[in-house]
Amino acid sequence: MTIRDIAKAAGVSPATVSLVLNNKSGVSEERRQVIQRLLTQNGYEKRCHDKSSLNILFVKYVQYGTIVEHNGDFINRVLDGLQDEADKLRINLTMRNLNSHHFDEIMDCFKTGGYHGSIILGTELDDAFAQKLEHSPIPTVVLDNMVENYELDSVVMDNRGCAFSGVRYLIECGHRKIGFVKSKYDISNFHQRYEGYRSALEKHDIPFEEKYVFEVEPTMHGAYHDMLNALSKGRELPTSFFAGNDSMGAGVVKALKQYSYRVPEQISMIGIDDLPFCSISDPMLTTMAIPKETMGRMAVRRMYEKVLGDSQECIKKLLYPHLVERESVAKL
């Protein structure tokens, strides 16, 4: 049984069950005993929330592998923020990997592993798994995915706003033929960035042209080869691209240069992430920088609030990126 099921059986709200599970006040003794009996019968362990001994499980969820496993720089910076905030709050942080085939295993771990809460790296999180997470027996915060349609706390970049701002910058630089480097994998973040791109064009009365959307693997190597294939077919090119991430942008730039296109003189490029290679690539890549460490710190802080019962509302936190101007965008 999930927390919601137990709440229904006991005739109380899920929040009341959470109070008992987390050994908090605010529940009558008679009702507490009923709820505790149901919790025990279903394998839930009462947790003692001494502020000096909170145990949080960080789960790196992998659905495709291509996106998460090829973005180690991004993830490592997020982890730096997670660990830094956990150390400040005296939280024990345990890390595990998870794919869609091991959901039952991780739910058992939530129930019996002695964890007070979990933080899920949800970059590749799909709807099916998000729906299951809504019934998590412990407080859960999703990182790097808005999980818009689900009652789950989240900390994520404003993907739509980020893409909108990046495309607006290209427009301010004089570009009207603006393409989009789109991931073949339609995860939430990439989809929202595409929406932001479309929205910016519409806002500035620039017609959307499907021919300027190039689908590639969301890795530098994959984007390079997919763009080479597109160029070999003689596809018409815009004067600039907004890429769904830096890796795709860099891969496309490499392919363009191999076909003797000059970047940014002939074709400009802007990405998202501000990964380390952006400052040493040729040309150095203009990008929208994500506050990665801040994302990690905010996820831990939000989990801390939930576990201690300071805030039980579902809160979704958006972080706004900022533009880092380098060498890959030309003014027309």
Please name every model-derived segment.
Residues 38, 81-85, 132, 192-204, ...:
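Alpha-helical structural signal in soluble globular domains
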Residues 1-53:
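N-terminal helix-turn-helix DNA-binding module of bacterial transcription factors
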Residues 13, 45, 116, 176-177, ...:
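Short acidic/polar active-site loop segments enriched in Thr and Asp
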Residues 226-332:
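Flexible loop/turn connectors
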Residues 61-76, 95-103, 155-165, 181-228, ...:
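Hinge/beta->alpha junction and helix N-cap segments in small-molecule ligand-binding domains
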Residues 55-168, 172, 231-232, 236, ...:
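Alpha-helical recognition/docking segments in bacterial nutrient-uptake
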Residues 59-61, 121, 143, 180-181, ...:
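Short hydrophobic segments within beta-strands
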